[in-house]
Amino acid sequence: MSTAVTMLTDTWSRRAKRFEIEGYAKILAIGTATPANWVDQTTYPDFYFRITNSQHLLEHKEKFRRICNKSNIRKRHMVLTEELLKKNPNLCTYNDASLNTRQDILVSEVPKLGKEAAMKAIKVWGRPISEITHLVFCTTSGVDMPGADFQLTKLLGLNSSVKRLMMYQQGCNAGAAMLRLAKDLAENNKGARVLVVCSEVMLSVFRGPSLQQEDNLLAQCLFGDGSAAIIIGTDPRPGLETPLFELISAAQTIIPDTDSHLKLHVREMGLTFHCSKAVPTFITQNVEDCLVKAFEPYGISDWNSIFWVLHPGGNAIVEGVEETLGLAPEKLRASRDVLSEYGNLTSACVLFILDEVRKKSKKDEQ
């Protein structure tokens, strides 16, 4: 298990403008997208056990209902529809071979959803698409060659010379990792404009319930579909580009002896999910040490003096971090809002939260 910390400066705030430094990477635009289809978390247990032909598992269903009720998730967007599931019944069992079915859907839907977010970011940016020099694409599922980065290049009509990087199966830490990678690319390639796209369709983990693998219920409760795109570059051109955030530094820390507590494996049945009950505890016990290492060089030790873009791996993690660090309730409001409205969006989640922080900052400035 690893934690990633990216220090961002809100360039709308008067205080932050002191830190605008030539050559540092800046976020120039953000765009997000979700599938039109969505599910209500309160009624989802009924739908889930009906569509998977598992209504006879009454105790299991009630347990799932309790998990959903405690999740602080109101709704989730999904590519999966009842019609699609009825056409592909092998997706609704726990362990039927279904990888081919999943792949056929994912290799099409992941780039398409990514395009929606990218087009929104490009519109906000306001510059010609031909000025994009680099593309970094990230997704947890749908491994294929040519990859989703290549497909998106065609969908957007990017230059054939655009420098592409495809990152598969990096999980929830990938959102912050993409910021770190894009920062390095922008700061080491003068004039670069890096398009980062995180597109997640969690069809890969959808499956029927299992009495032997109860953490599968957590996956069925938690994950949603969505894509987010950002454009990053240095030295924005006055009057042509508007910086939203500045990326000051990035750090990543591995928590020892935790690799067995959170695992996803590709199998014939799709992507299996294992999460031990100790994960929130590991995070809350180690979060402050990670923050000290990241922020000490900048003289920051008051965790309420900074703004937060916390990946909400689950409600227990959000509450644990808040309590451990003594954070004021408003510090993690954006994380809670995104979790409530979309669920855990894996790599795209922190970018959705970053956009929420941007919207609130802009509103406060006005």
UniProtKB/Swiss-Prot annotation:
GO molecular-function annotation terms?
A: naringenin-chalcone synthase activity
Entry keyword set:
Acyltransferase, Flavonoid biosynthesis, Transferase
Query: Which PROSITE patterns does the record associate with it?
Result: CHALCONE_SYNTH (PS00441)
Offer one example of a GO biological process linked to this entry.
polyketide biosynthetic process
Principal EC category: transferase
What InterPro entries does the entry give? Answer: Chalcone/stilbene_synt_C, Chalcone/stilbene_synt_N, Chalcone/stilbene_synthase_AS, Polyketide_synthase_type-III, Thiolase-like
Give the annotated active site.
C172
Q: Tell me its EC number(s), please.
A: 2.3.1.74
Task: Show the catalytic activity.
Answer: (E)-4-coumaroyl-CoA + 3 malonyl-CoA + 3 H(+) = 2',4,4',6'-tetrahydroxychalcone + 3 CO2 + 4 CoA
- Pfam families per UniProt: Chal_sti_synt_C (PF02797), Chal_sti_synt_N (PF00195)
Carries keyword Transferase?
A: yes
Q: Under which pathway is this protein filed?
A: Secondary metabolite biosynthesis; flavonoid biosynthesis
Q: From the record, give the transmembrane residue ranges.
A: none
| Family, as annotated | Belongs to the thiolase-like superfamily. Chalcone/stilbene synthases family.
What is the recorded function of this protein according to its Swiss-Prot or TrEMBL entry? The primary product of this enzyme is 4,2',4',6'-tetrahydroxychalcone (also termed naringenin-chalcone or chalcone) which can under specific conditions spontaneously isomerize into naringenin.
Q: What is this protein called?
A: Chalcone synthase B
Q: What is the lineage of its organism?
A: Eukaryota, Viridiplantae, Streptophyta, Embryophyta, Tracheophyta
Gene this chain is encoded by: CHSB
